[in-house]
Design a protein with these regions (language model features):
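Extracytoplasmic "Venus flytrap"
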Residues: 21-38, 58-63
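Immediate post-signal peptide segment of exported/extracytoplasmic ligand-binding proteins
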Residues: 15-24, 37, 41-52, 124, ...
Length: 170
């Protein structure tokens, strides 16, 4: 549904400028890559000589799980994760669940009214600071039996799911 942008609480500071290492798993041309590249372009323009955001895409710094560990260690400063967040804390599972968000207008409302408080609480629990939410498309469940439009439509359907306990529970 949406992807959470995570930042470590501390940045690596060199003698003259701040270096921000920003990792993600997206391949060139993906929404992950386009989003992070655009962020880096805007940030670098504003930072000028004060620092630089360097992007490491295509899992150059590891998969999501390793990226999140590197945030904790301080060897990477920002990470754009995917479904791995639900394994860090249950509340992040909201991003894995289909049928919760009806459309973009609904998501905008949730983003403004619900997520800020949720993320503030999660920072204290997890040590990760969520600084933005970016779209990564809406979740759809597909199969070769019938359309899935409501959770009830899943009855009797066997599916393979990514490693997300909330998707498995559904």
């Amino acid at each position: 549904l949406f992807v959470v942008l995570i930042s470590a609480l501390f940045l690596t500071i060199s003698a003259n400028a701040v270096e921000v290492k920003f990792g993600h798993v997206g391949k060139p041309g993906s929404l992950f890559s386009a989003s992070v590249d655009h962020f880096a372009k805007l940030a670098n323009k504003r930072l000028g000589s004060k620092g630089k955001v360097t992007v490491f895409g295509s899992s150059q710094l590891g998969k999501d799980k390793q990226g999140m560990q590197k945030l904790k260690l301080g060897t990477v400063n920002m990470w754009l994760p995917s479904s791995v967040m639900a394994s860090i804390h249950d509340e992040f599972g909201v991003f894995d669940m289909p049928f919760i968000i009806k459309n973009r207008k609904h998501m905008n409302k949730v983003e403004k009214q619900v997520l800020p408080g949720m993320f503030k609480n999660l920072e204290a629990k997890t040590g990760y600071k969520v600084i933005a939410v970016w779209e990564n498309g809406f979740r759809h469940i597909t199969n070769n039996k019938r359309a899935i439009n409501t959770p009830g439509d899943l009855k009797g359907i066997k599916l393979r799911t990514p490693k997300s306990k909330w998707r498995v529970k559904m």
